[in-house]
Each structure stands twice: as C-alpha cells, then as structure tokens.
Amino acid sequence: STAAASSPVPAGAHQVTYTVTTTSDLTANIYYVSADPPDQASANKPQFMPMARTQVGPSAPWTLQTTLNDPTQWGFVSASGGLRVNPEFRCEIAVDGKVVVSQQGGSGVQCALRPW
C-alpha cells in the first residue's frame, strides 16, 4: 500500500457512517460532507455539505451512510439546536464500520477527522 503511515484510512472508496444523538427530543440542524469535494473552497457548497433539519432524541438517533474516497480529509458532521434546553449532542464518525472519532457538546457538536 502507498497510503501514508499517519493516515488512519487508506485512499479508495470507504463507507462512512455519521451518527448524531441527543439526551432530549428536538429539531436539529445537521451539516455533513456527503461526497468528496474537489478542494476545501468547495467543501461548504450544498452539493458536498448538505443540511438536514430533522427530529433527534434519545430513542431517535440520526444516522447517515455515504461513501468518501478520502474520509481522513473530508469526514465531517456537525449538529446544533435546542436553545431552550441543553440537549447534550453527541456525534460519531465510523469508517468501514470502525468508530474513528466521537465528540460530546452542549447545544452543538462537531466531529471531523482533521481540524476544520
């Protein structure tokens, strides 16, 4: 393999699973990278980073699977919402079935495989 030793995921098509959970029921705004953008400047465009406005709660996690060629570069999910109550957001990114990052936050949270 020619993948860099520091890269946790070799290049090629990888199954990426984003999961967002909360401790209370609410409508969340969830942004996620759905496809590899050609460059960082394009990453925020809706065709690469759509927004899902959806109900999330303790018994209703939000999960989305997509395929990314370079999840180390582009794996990203963020969620926010719940201004009246602290929903204790939690996000997780799994690559090829293995959780590679998870974070917890109050009224918002972000998971990425590199600094954004």
Give the role of each language-model region.
Residues 1-13, 38-49:
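N-terminal low-complexity, Pro/Thr-rich disordered segments
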Residues 10-23, 71-79:
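Noncatalytic modules at the cell exterior or secretory-pathway interfaces
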Residues 18, 31-32:
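Aromatic side chains
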Residues 26-29, 87-89:
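Short beta-strand/loop motifs in extracellular/secreted proteins, especially
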Residues 32-83:
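Mature extracytoplasmic domains of secretory-pathway proteins
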Residues 34, 113-116:
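Short beta-strand-to-coil "C-cap" segments at the C-terminal boundary of structured domains/repeats
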Residues 61-114:
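Extracytosolic low-complexity repeat regions of secreted or lipid-anchored proteins
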